[in-house]
Each structure stands twice: as structure tokens, then as C-alpha cells.
């Protein structure tokens, strides 16, 4: 509940400020790239969040099974993220060949796609690490808000804004990744162990 409130309040605060400060054309560029990024994200995560939350919840009392499920899903998500990110960066010229600003925004927002490798919030939720999730989210949102107010001061600061948003997302995932390593461990996984997961993840 607390995280949902944060997710409502902070976008209102930042959105109002940014819409007032940034050039409307540049802000429109940001939103356009954000729309394109939202197309790539599902392919990077491959449905791991929903499936992983349920799968870890079912085996959370068994350490060995938890480690195996975590490792399977992490490696699969990592593979999907690498493939998707490669396609994302390889095709950016197709979208904005003659617009340098859009290209820069596109490249910087690619950081969010790369960061999906460390997106393991489904493990924290399954293990009910709710206090950690709330405080981590609150601190990152506050730092993001302060950074926007401090550095986005001119109508041309769209790249700075994009960088702040992308690094905030990456930091959120990376912190969770290192936090969860106290609860789960990587185990050796064979490719054949991943095949049974494909259909459930696509469902």
C-alpha cells in the first residue's frame, strides 16, 4: 500500500515540475521514447515477475528449491534482457535517423532496459521483504526528486532529466539485487532446466 502511494505522489510532483520547466517539444521526445521503451520491456522481462512471484511463494520454505527457481528465472531473464537490449540499441537509427536529441534520449533510456537484468523485485515480494521495498523506494524517489529540482532548471535539460530517470530505475534494481543475495544463492543450472519454464511464462 505504501509503495502504491509513493508511485502516485512522486509522478505528480515531478510531472508537474518537468512539464513547466522543460521545452514541450523535448518533453514530447522523452514521452515518445518512453512509449517505444515500453514495447521492448515485456520482451526483456518475459513474464518473469508474475510467474516468479508465484513460483517463489510456493517453495519459499525450501531453501534449495527457492535457490533453484530463483537461478532458473534470473538466468532466463538475463538472456532475454541481453537479446532485447541488443535489438534496442541496434535499431535506434531506424526511429530517429535525423534527430540527434531523440537519439541521445533513446540511448540514455536504454539504461533502463539493461537494468532489467537486476530486476528481482518478485523475489522480495515473494519473501515478503515489504519494509525493505518501501524504504528503498522512498529513498530513491526522494533522491530522484531532489536531483530533478536541482539539475533540471532549463528548458533544454531533457538529457539530464532522462539520465536522472534512467539511473533511478537502475539504482532501484541494483540495490534490490544485492539485498536479496542474503536470502537466495545462485546454483548451477543447465539449459534443459529452463525449457519447462517457457510455456508457463508465455501463458
What do these predicted ranges mean?
Residues 113-135:
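Membrane-interface junctions at transmembrane-helix termini in multi-pass inner-membrane proteins
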Residues 1-4, 38-39, 73, 77, ...:
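Residue-level signature of transmembrane alpha-helical cores of multipass secondary-active transporters
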Residues 4, 8, 35-38, 81, ...:
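Residue-level recognition of pore/gate-forming positions within transmembrane alpha-helices
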Residues 22-33, 59-71, 82-114, 154-161:
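Membrane-interface helix-capping segments at transmembrane helix termini in multi-pass transporters
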Residues 131-135, 158-165, 171-203:
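Interhelical loop/hinge segments that connect adjacent transmembrane helices in multipass membrane
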Residues 19-26, 93-103, 127-132, 138-173:
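Membrane-interface helix-loop junctions in multi-pass transport and translocation proteins
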Amino acid at each position: 500500500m505504501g509503495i502504491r502511494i509513493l508511485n502516485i505522489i512522486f509522478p505528480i510532483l515531478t510531472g508537474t515540475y518537468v512539464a513547466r520547466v522543460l521545452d514541450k517539444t523535448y518533453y514530447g521526445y522523452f514521452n515518445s521514447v518512453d512509449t517505444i521503451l515500453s514495447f521492448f520491456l515485456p520482451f526483456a522481462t518475459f513474464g518473469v515477475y508474475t510467474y516468479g512471484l508465484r513460483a517463489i511463494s510456493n517453495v519459499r520454505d525450501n531453501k534449495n528449491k527457492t535457490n533453484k527457481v530463483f537461478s532458473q528465472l534470473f538466468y532466463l531473464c538475463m538472456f532475454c534482457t541481453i537479446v532485447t537490449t541488443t535489438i534496442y540499441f541496434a535499431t535506434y537509427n531506424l526511429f530517429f535517423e535525423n534527430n540527434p536529441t531523440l537519439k541521445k534520449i533513446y540511448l540514455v533510456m536504454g539504461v533502463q532496459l539493461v537494468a532489467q537484468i537486476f530486476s528481482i523485485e518478485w523475489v522480495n515480494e515473494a519473501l515478503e521483504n515489504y519494509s525493505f521495498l518501501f524504504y528503498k523506494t522512498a529513498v530513491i524517489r526522494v533522491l530522484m526528486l531532489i536531483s530533478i529540482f536541482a539539475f533540471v532548471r532549463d528548458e533544454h535539460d531533457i538529457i539530464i532529466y532522462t539520465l536522472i530517470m534512467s539511473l533511478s530505475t537502475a539504482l532501484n534494481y541494483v540495490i534490490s539485487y544485492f539485498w536479496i543475495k542474503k536470502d537466495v544463492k545462485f546454483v548451477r543450472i543447465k539449459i534443459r532446466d529452463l525449457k519447462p519454464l517457457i510455456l508457463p511464462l508465455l501463458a
